[in-house]
């Protein structure tokens, strides 16, 4: 009986995409999607090998964005991205600079950090 050879999946190319950067006080998540919002690749500072207090640094956020950008360029041939930033973290500017240094063209940067209009009650104040 003959073995049936299967042909590998056809490589999809996404020239344009969206990079979502979620910067919290403890970590930074970088998610690369197509223009419809389907996730293509993602990474975080913790997944790049940083731990503890080093995860919240701008350098670590830049490294995570660099890893996500290289992944998107190699696997999908991405060239042009628009950036959406969410969260109050420190690494957002470093992440955008890292995307540009990897060869991606950044067309727009949107800050969509959620701002409460006096919504939920805050936690009690810490007494040290």
From Swiss-Prot:
Pfam families: Ribosomal_S11
This protein's UniProt keywords: Ribonucleoprotein, Ribosomal protein, RNA-binding, rRNA-binding
Gene Ontology BP term (one): translation
Molecular function GO labels: rRNA binding; structural constituent of ribosome
Keyword Cytoplasm: no
GO cellular component, one term: ribosome
Cited HAMAP family: Ribosomal_uS11 (MF_01310)
Family: Belongs to the universal ribosomal protein uS11 family.
NCBIfam families according to UniProt: PRK05309.1 (NF003698), uS11_bact (TIGR03632)
Subunit comment: Part of the 30S ribosomal subunit. Interacts with proteins S7 and S18. Binds to IF-3.
Function: Located on the platform of the 30S subunit, it bridges several disparate RNA helices of the 16S rRNA. Forms part of the Shine-Dalgarno cleft in the 70S ribosome.
Protein's recorded name: Small ribosomal subunit protein uS11
Organism per entry: Wolbachia sp. subsp. Drosophila simulans (strain wRi)
Gene from which the chain derives: rpsK
């Amino acid at each position: 009986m003959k073995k049936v050879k299967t042909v590998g999946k056809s490589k999809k190319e996404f020239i344009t995409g969206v990079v979502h950067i979620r910067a919290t006080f403890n970590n930074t998540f970088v998610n690369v999607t197509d223009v419809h919002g389907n996730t293509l690749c993602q990474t975080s500072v913790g997944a790049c090998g940083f731990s503890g207090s080093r995860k919240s640094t701008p350098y670590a956020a830049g490294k995570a964005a660099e890893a996500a950008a290289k992944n998107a360029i190699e696997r999908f041939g991405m060239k042009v991205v628009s950036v959406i930033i969410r969260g109050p973290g420190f690494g957002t500017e470093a992440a955008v600079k890292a995307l540009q240094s990897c060869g991606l063209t950044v067309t727009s940067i949107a800050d969509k950090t959620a701002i409460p209009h006096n919504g939920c009650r805050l936690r009690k104040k810490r007494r040290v």
